[in-house]
Amino acid sequence: MALLMPRPSEQTPWVQRRGQCGTWGPEYAQLHDDVLSGRTREQYLVVEGIEGLADSLSLIAGMLYVAVLSGRALQIRENVPYSVAYDKPNIDWRETSKSRTMTEQHFTLRTGGPLPFDEPAFRLIYNGSIEELGAGADIVTMFGNVGVINVLFNNPVYKVQLYKMGLRPETAYGCALEYLFTPSLSVKEHFRDEIITMTGSSMKIGIQVRLGDSYLRGGVFEEQKHADASLLAVQHFFECAEQLQAAFRQPGQNVVWLLISDSLDIRSLSKTEYGDKLLVKLDEPSHVAGMTGHEQNQAMIAAAGEHWLFGLADYHVISSIGGFGRSAALRAQTWNTVYKLDVYQTNLLQCDGLKMKPLTWDDIANTAPFV
């Protein structure tokens, strides 16, 4: 039977989670404040994520540790409105204006396939020295969609430092997101009922059905939108949830399922089928990067809220494609709780938690867009 790692209360301040996330947080917050206030040399690591929210969060989470290890203040370039969806519990990560006399170097960590070993920044993080990243420049700007946490934990030097900081590969991603972000008031208001349910004592199973960006409003391939999605084609995701429920539910425990999907049809059909047992928003899913203005703000609130809620689940049934479900599940800081299924591959219906092997950290982290 899969073992759950004890999860700290969502209301517990990060500084009190030292048994799970280490003790480095307050010290880095002081360094960050010293840099921003000019009390120490101004050295910044500015991060600009691309593609979808999950890709960007993967880059941002890894770059937090690069900033910690190199003594730079992390800042996030808001090419999408992070501040609309997230508050800043420990450091103010918003990008600030810089003096024109400051030196700057730009790097790219971008991929749509294998890890970008040919990128200079990746090579330094993988088996070199982070201190050489930027070669003393005041500002290092990192642009991309690739996470480097797993890479850092494979670097013979930095993995030792990360372990001494109290971090582990299985928890580092979730710890980074919790350090940087808490849901904004707008997110909490939009998902008020869902938050109450997902922070209760019920057994919570998250289900992510990803069909592709063509189903998203504002998605890259929206003009190629497929025919209406059929619930029958993805029924094995819900059968998997039923099997996990049968295997791990405690006697008398209530069960709730949380569904996130890029298909409005799947959301609507599933709600009709499963009723009150299923938590699901019936707003049309939108691609954050494909929207502008007020519509982009609303898309960001929806995406960030569902990503955060999914991390509250005890077990996660995710699609094999894309990074949204995987990265949201990693926020939970648990292991042996993530089960991957292929969309439309209905001949593989077994998801019995006692028989089917859950994903390991490496399974999750070493699949594009990586963590």
Give residue ranges: language-model regions:
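Short, charged/polar "capping" segments at the starts of alpha-helices
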Residues: Y82-A85, S263-S270
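Secretory-pathway glycan-assembly enzymes, especially type II membrane glycosyltransferases
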Residues: L3-Q235, A241-E242, A246-V255
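Donor nucleotide-activated moiety binding/catalytic core segment of transferases
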Residues: K277-A313
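A donor-sugar binding/catalytic signature common to diverse glycosyltransferases
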Residues: A61, A303-L349
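Short beta-strand/turn micro-motifs composed of small residues
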Residues: E78, V209, L259-S261, V317-I318
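Leloir-type glycosyltransferase catalytic cores
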Residues: V343-V371
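Short hydrophobic/aromatic-enriched beta-strand-loop microsegments
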Residues: D276-E284, N336-V343
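Short, well-ordered alpha-helical microsegments
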Residues: S56, I60, I266-S268, G325-R326
